[in-house]
Amino acid sequence: MGLKHFLEKIEPHFLPGGKHEKWYALYEAAATIFYTSGAVTRKAAHVRDALDSKRMMILVWLALFPAMFYGMYNVGAQAFGALTPDLLQQNIANDWHYAFANALGINMSSEAGVSDKMLFGAIYFLPIYATVFVVGGFWEVLFATVRKHEINEGFFVTSILFALIVPPTLPLWQAALGISFGVVVAKEVFGGTGKNFMNPALAGRAFLFFAYPANLSGDAVWTAVDGYSGATALAQWAAHGADGLKNAVTGQTITWMDAFIGKLPGSIGEVSTLALLIGGAFIVFARIASWRIIAGVMIGMIAMSSLFNFIGSDTNAMFAMPWYWHLVVGGFAIGMLFMATDPVSASFTNVGKWWYGALIGVMCVLIRVVNPAYPEGMMLAILFANLFAPIFDYFVAQANIKRRKARSNG
């Protein structure tokens, strides 16, 4: 018996009147992973496309894999570089991640190979991702079952994005709390997928940032070594300018290429601009992400950073950060490529996408430079722009209406 025949055989049990009808959302989610839905339109308008929403979300999910794999490697690389023999023994005794890595025989030294660093990073990342996926998936299934809706695959993207934009040291219960806020409050309360006006992953991270700032900011959360502190590149620049960009372990200067590749501490998936550009190029080529939004973000960021460079400041080193450094530090790249381009919370109109993207770029630099307490600005910039996306679309639509009326009256 083939899989398709088996699914067709059990489908009546999940339809209205069947003994398992309340679990239809789960059946539909599993069945459409392997086969497209048999539903067809019965009246206009008919839209034909080779890519349905499920496949589109899975492609975005896969596009994040380069950043995910490099992020896991970097977690190990940063930790092993910071470890001393005393810190290693202390962490093995007090941290289950280290105890598990030690039981697996992982070489936790500065001489460790790529596989050891990758496996160590996976011990930190995978529990966070699994927690986010299970807890967020529970809320998705619950709301889909109550509303008798299908389970939307957008959660594949939300879950991995959330796991990639948090520090590797985030407690699992906070990961569960953050994704719960993002899914329930930022999405399901407004009607579910397609009706949320904010990016759920960013909303969840913002909730954690303001509720538990000690676990998402400061110098002690970015390197997975208890008892070690190491500032991010943004924090170093804000404190000491370009000359302050130093590797906390070796004392060597962090170059632009180091930052571009991702040889620095930070949230798991945001560190490597190179890996993010690989995935971003794929979703732009597949016409999933809007190139207009990405271009708008870059234009806004370059314009605002150039303005601050021109103004200058003797007391604020962030005024001197050039645009090409803004691009490779913090969460700018992952925000621009994978969050600003969220088709639900972004502007719909082509002109609106330019303004929406430009606002994100401007606000990101403005927050980074002017707010001394918060050197990272991409998260708040995107959430702020999400609120303005419908306004941009409204004015674009009104301008088109006025233009058509003027033509018809002329």
Curated annotation (Swiss-Prot):
Superkingdom assignment: Bacteria
Requisite cofactors: FMN
Record has Transport as a keyword: yes
Pfam families: NQR2_RnfD_RnfE
UniProt xrefs under InterPro entries: NqrB, NqrB/RnfD
Transmembrane portions of the chain: 56-76, 119-139, 159-179, 266-286, 293-313, 318-338, 347-367, 377-397
Main location: membrane
GO biological process per UniProt: respiratory electron transport chain; sodium ion transport; transmembrane transport
Family: Belongs to the NqrB/RnfD family.
Task performed by this protein: NQR complex catalyzes the reduction of ubiquinone-1 to ubiquinol by two successive reactions, coupled with the transport of Na(+) ions from the cytoplasm to the periplasm. NqrA to NqrE are probably involved in the second step, the conversion of ubisemiquinone to ubiquinol.
PANTHER family reported for this sequence: ELECTRON TRANSPORT COMPLEX PROTEIN RNFD, NA(+)-TRANSLOCATING NADH-QUINONE REDUCTASE SUBUNIT B
Quaternary data: Composed of six subunits; NqrA, NqrB, NqrC, NqrD, NqrE and NqrF.
NCBIfam families recorded: nqrB (TIGR01937), PRK05349.1 (NF003756)
Name this polypeptide is given: Na(+)-translocating NADH-quinone reductase subunit B
Species in which this protein is naturally found: Neisseria meningitidis serogroup B (strain ATCC BAA-335 / MC58)
